[in-house]
Amino acid sequence: MKELIICNNIKLIKEEIHKKKIEISKRNNKEYYEIKVGFVPTMGYLHSGHISLVERAKLENDIVVVSIFVNPTQFNANEDLSSYPSDIENDSKLLKNVGTDLLFLPTPDIMYPKESGYSTFVTVESMEQVMEGKSRPGHFRGVATIVTKLLLITTPTNLYIGQKDAMQCICIKRLVADLNIDTNVIICNTIREDTGLAKSSRNSYLSNEEQIQASSIYKILESFKNNINSFTDRQSFINEITKQLEQNPLFKVEYVSIASNITGLEIIDQFPPPKDSNLSLALLFFAEKRKTRLIDIIIL
């Protein structure tokens, strides 16, 4: 089994990527610049959705780098930063089992050094206007900043992210294009439980019974997608989705969005919307142990 090299600082991860490139270049008689690096950024507590990204990265690259970093700047004050699930030991085993080359495991002080008076952030301005951005002020500034930093550190050929976080996908594609970062952003299909519930580290907050209840989210979205032509206008469509979801008294819908899959902005003036638009939502599930925020998306 391939050794997983764990790097907990920036200098080390850069050195290890460089060493791997030289090694592969010599072994396979390839030019250094031809060596492809696949990168999967995560916040840890890995599940089969994350692993599917790593497996695809392995198929398409010479070197696979995964990062685990619970990024504090993308959490608001009332969110779950302090309680976000973590199991580095198990994550490392999973990554080793699928043949990951390098694991970048920085601390907040490494990514946001306080002693230097850290004050630089990346803002994709359009993301403040999307529904998820309005619902979580400052979230996308945190996402854009950490992803930019990770890309500058790892300089990957390809970056792999899951479609479930649709607005993050749009944000990252925009920043890579606008900042002329030489990385391909590859969006991978959402991985779901057999029940339809989208895989998420936050599902660990829910009991088995609550996860079954949460699986109704995807089923309701699919049902409305299949019946969209029976509605005459956008607002009645959204209202009915909200109404059906909130038949479960433990669900409180934050928003239902019909948006462009390119900009993330709401499609107001066309219904039914163009093919491949995003139908997404966020809701609060008032579960027994804690309030849990769930998101999901399907492509229309």
Curated annotation (Swiss-Prot):
<feature type="active site" description="Proton donor">
    <location>
        <position position="50"/>
    </location>
</feature>
<dbReference type="GO" id="GO:0004592">
    <property type="term" value="F:pantoate-beta-alanine ligase activity"/>
</dbReference>
<keyword id="KW-0067">ATP-binding</keyword>
<dbReference type="GO" id="GO:0005829">
    <property type="term" value="C:cytosol"/>
</dbReference>
<feature type="binding site">
    <location>
        <position position="168"/>
    </location>
    <ligand>
        <name>(R)-pantoate</name>
    </ligand>
</feature>
<keyword id="KW-0547">Nucleotide-binding</keyword>
<dbReference type="InterPro" id="IPR004821">
    <property type="entry name" value="Cyt_trans-like"/>
</dbReference>
<feature type="binding site">
    <location>
        <begin position="199"/>
        <end position="202"/>
    </location>
    <ligand>
        <name>ATP</name>
    </ligand>
</feature>
<keyword id="KW-0963">Cytoplasm</keyword>
<dbReference type="Pfam" id="PF02569">
    <property type="entry name" value="Pantoate_ligase"/>
</dbReference>
<keyword id="KW-0436">Ligase</keyword>
<comment type="pathway">
    <text>Cofactor biosynthesis; (R)-pantothenate biosynthesis; (R)-pantothenate from (R)-pantoate and beta-alanine: step 1/1.</text>
</comment>
<comment type="function">
    <text>Catalyzes the condensation of pantoate with beta-alanine in an ATP-dependent reaction via a pantoyl-adenylate intermediate.</text>
</comment>
<feature type="binding site">
    <location>
        <position position="191"/>
    </location>
    <ligand>
        <name>ATP</name>
    </ligand>
</feature>
<keyword id="KW-0566">Pantothenate biosynthesis</keyword>
<protein>
    <recommendedName>
        <fullName>Pantoate--beta-alanine ligase</fullName>
        <ecNumber>6.3.2.1</ecNumber>
    </recommendedName>
</protein>
<dbReference type="InterPro" id="IPR014729">
    <property type="entry name" value="Rossmann-like_a/b/a_fold"/>
</dbReference>
<dbReference type="GO" id="GO:0005524">
    <property type="term" value="F:ATP binding"/>
</dbReference>
<dbReference type="GO" id="GO:0015940">
    <property type="term" value="P:pantothenate biosynthetic process"/>
</dbReference>
<comment type="subunit">
    <text>Homodimer.</text>
</comment>
<feature type="binding site">
    <location>
        <position position="74"/>
    </location>
    <ligand>
        <name>(R)-pantoate</name>
    </ligand>
</feature>
<feature type="binding site">
    <location>
        <begin position="43"/>
        <end position="50"/>
    </location>
    <ligand>
        <name>ATP</name>
    </ligand>
</feature>
<dbReference type="InterPro" id="IPR042176">
    <property type="entry name" value="Pantoate_ligase_C"/>
</dbReference>
<feature type="binding site">
    <location>
        <position position="74"/>
    </location>
    <ligand>
        <name>beta-alanine</name>
    </ligand>
</feature>
<feature type="binding site">
    <location>
        <begin position="162"/>
        <end position="165"/>
    </location>
    <ligand>
        <name>ATP</name>
    </ligand>
</feature>
<dbReference type="InterPro" id="IPR003721">
    <property type="entry name" value="Pantoate_ligase"/>
</dbReference>
<comment type="similarity">
    <text>Belongs to the pantothenate synthetase family.</text>
</comment>
